[in-house]
């Protein structure tokens, strides 16, 4: 739906927040596995695609291969393993068409808050129309948050002393101007994460100079743009079979390397630095610019397709400076070492602001839900919060690997509740259970938000697992029920629309 129209018969079975990768995946799973359930997707922006439509900076691409970043039910058939945003948006659009999801998506509809009503067994959800600012209320049995984990309206921008004096442009990649012409300009990119290492080679051929200014280096690895095994399998096997085998292969390799880094941090560090040295000139100071003070996978590794960043540096088209910023000046950035980086454009690729569940406020019978006092159940529900599910992917692998498992498990849960006659499901955390941060991840954007996030426990089902194959056993093959889930049937709760029609017909 390109504009606000009436939702299907309320209360909806499932209300999905967000029409990005996770939201489209959740809706497709419902269509495939629970075709009788009513649902709608509310998207706060004007278009689908989430991250891949929001970010418009040069070179934007995935940093995970599309065989694992894609949906398990929809093969990725293009040659490129690391895809750009346009290809990913095309893939998502195809998924919408193939599952006839377009009529279920309402754009510019922002969920503001949701209140669980125990007496009715329903969520009352307040929604703001982005065009008229009018507020309406939608009722649903399940609320599914698929809006990612960061604020769409604001990236993280630390205050730099003297920034108001700079005469050039200061740009955050999350809000890239469509008309920006950087041809022949001197550019400084502040940051060393995935965005920075994508921007540098994408801009290098047009600028007069471009420098990646980093306070702390990142581990950066060369990744082939194409997957030779996948190409061979596509020639000899049906598309879905070839895709599934490639997906399995890549998930295994990624998890095995992550496990190797966790078990042998010193050895893995030496290996990564050795690989980096092979990509750069012999006299390049790798230990200065590519040697982080933390172990591999304490923060996410950065992938560069066909070593494009290394090639730009080796050709003299890009530069890296590792230093601290003293202040901005009229003409660039003054470093604490005394060095001056002259610039016409400064790009602050300094990260994201974490915001779970789209920033909505959750209530239970009018009382606010304090997220930091909840525990994540199977990485998809919250203790003490009935009929609420969410999709947060892996930090050590492809996001969508986890999302697909969560959506599959969610559909199994809906099926069980329908068969058993339940309409309410609520995880109950054990008394006095030891807790720890939801994400054991050193990235700055995660660390800044830990105090406002749910927690996790010491063991399943309260662990926020980062192991895909462990999660396959738990979420796809394991039992739906356990002693931590409380199921109830709320008397006189509104019935599913199909049941209402059947009963009305029998009365006639």
Curated annotation (Swiss-Prot):
Keywords: FAD, Flavoprotein, Monooxygenase, NADP, Oxidoreductase. FAD binds at residues 22, 43, 51-54, 63, 111. Signal peptide: none annotated. The keyword Oxidoreductase applies. NADP(+) binds at residues 61-63, 192-198, 215-216. InterPro entries: FAD-binding_MO (IPR051820), FAD/NAD-bd_sf (IPR036188), Flavin_mOase-like (IPR020946). Its EC number is 1.14.13.-. It is an enzyme of class 1 (oxidoreductase). Its cofactor is FAD. One of its GO terms (molecular function) is flavin adenine dinucleotide binding. Catalyzes a Baeyer-Villiger oxidation reaction, i.e. the insertion of an oxygen atom into a carbon-carbon bond adjacent to a carbonyl, which converts ketones to esters or lactones using NADPH and/or NADH as an electron donor. Preferentially converts short-chain aliphatic ketones like 2-decanone, 3-decanone and 4-decanone. Some acyclic ketones are converted not only to the alkylacetates, but also methyl- and ethylesters are obtained, indicating insertion of oxygen on both sides of the keto group. Belongs to the FAD-binding monooxygenase family. This is Baeyer-Villiger monooxygenase. It comes from Pseudomonas putida (strain ATCC 47054 / DSM 6125 / CFBP 8728 / NCIMB 11950 / KT2440).
């Amino acid at each position: 739906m390109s504009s606000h129209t009436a939702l299907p018969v309320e209360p909806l079975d499932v209300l999905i927040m967000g029409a990005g990768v996770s939201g489209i995946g959740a809706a497709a799973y419902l269509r495939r596995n629970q075709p009788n359930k009513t649902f709608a997707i509310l998207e706060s922006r004007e278009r689908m695609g989430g991250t891949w439509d929001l970010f418009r900076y040069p070179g934007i691409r995935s940093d995970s291969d599309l065989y694992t970043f894609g949906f398990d039910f929809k093969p990725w058939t293009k040659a490129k393993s690391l895809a750009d945003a346009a290809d990913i948006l095309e893939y998502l659009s195809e998924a919408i068409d193939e599952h006839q999801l377009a009529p279920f998506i309402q754009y510019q509809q922002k969920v503001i808050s949701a209140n669980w009503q125990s007496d009715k067994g329903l969520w009352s959800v307040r929604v703001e129309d982005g065009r008229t600012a009018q507020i309406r209320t939608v009722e649903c049995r399940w609320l599914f948050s698929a809006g990612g984990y960061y604020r769409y309206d604001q990236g993280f921008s630390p205050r730099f002393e003297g920034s108001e004096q700079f005469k050039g442009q200061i740009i955050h990649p999350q809000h890239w101007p469509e008309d920006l012409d950087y041809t022949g300009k001197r550019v400084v990119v502040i940051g060393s994460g995935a965005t920075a290492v994508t921007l540098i080679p994408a801009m290098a051929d047009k600028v007069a100079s471009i420098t990646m200014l980093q306070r702390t280096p990142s581990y950066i690895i060369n990744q082939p743009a194409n997957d030779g095994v996948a190409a061979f399998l596509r020639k000899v096997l049906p598309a879905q079979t070839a895709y599934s085998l490639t997906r399995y292969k890549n998930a295994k390799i990624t998890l095995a390397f992550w496990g190797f880094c966790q078990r042998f941090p010193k050895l893995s560090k030496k290996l990564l630095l050795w690989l980096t040295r092979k990509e750069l000139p012999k006299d390049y100071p790798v230990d200065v610019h590519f040697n982080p003070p933390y172990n591999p996978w304490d923060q996410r590794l950065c992938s560069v397709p066909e070593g494009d960043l290394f090639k730009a540096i080796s050709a003299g088209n890009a530069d890296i400076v590792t230093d601290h910023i003293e202040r901005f000046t009229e003409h660039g950035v003054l470093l604490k070492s005394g060095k001056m980086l002259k610039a016409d454009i400064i790009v602050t690729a300094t990260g994201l602001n974490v915001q779970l569940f789209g920033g909505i406020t959750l209530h239970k019978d009018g009382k606010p839900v304090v997220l930091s006092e909840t525990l994540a159940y199977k990485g998809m529900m919250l203790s003490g919060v009935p009929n609420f599910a969410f999709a947060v992917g892996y930090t050590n692998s492809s996001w969508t690997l986890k999302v697909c498992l969560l959506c599959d498990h969610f559909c199994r849960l809906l099926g069980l509740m329908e068969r058993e006659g339940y309409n309410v499901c609520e995880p109950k955390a054990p008394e006095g259970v030891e807790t720890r941060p939801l994400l054991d991840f050193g990235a700055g954007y995660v660390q800044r938000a830990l105090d406002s996030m749910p927690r996790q426990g010491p063991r399943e089902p309260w662990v926020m697992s980062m192991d895909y194959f462990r999660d396959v056993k738990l979420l796809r093959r394991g039992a739906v029920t356990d002693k931590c889930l409380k199921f109830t049937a709320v008397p006189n709760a509104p019935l599913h629309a199909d049941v209402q029609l059947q009963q009305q017909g029998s009365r006639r």
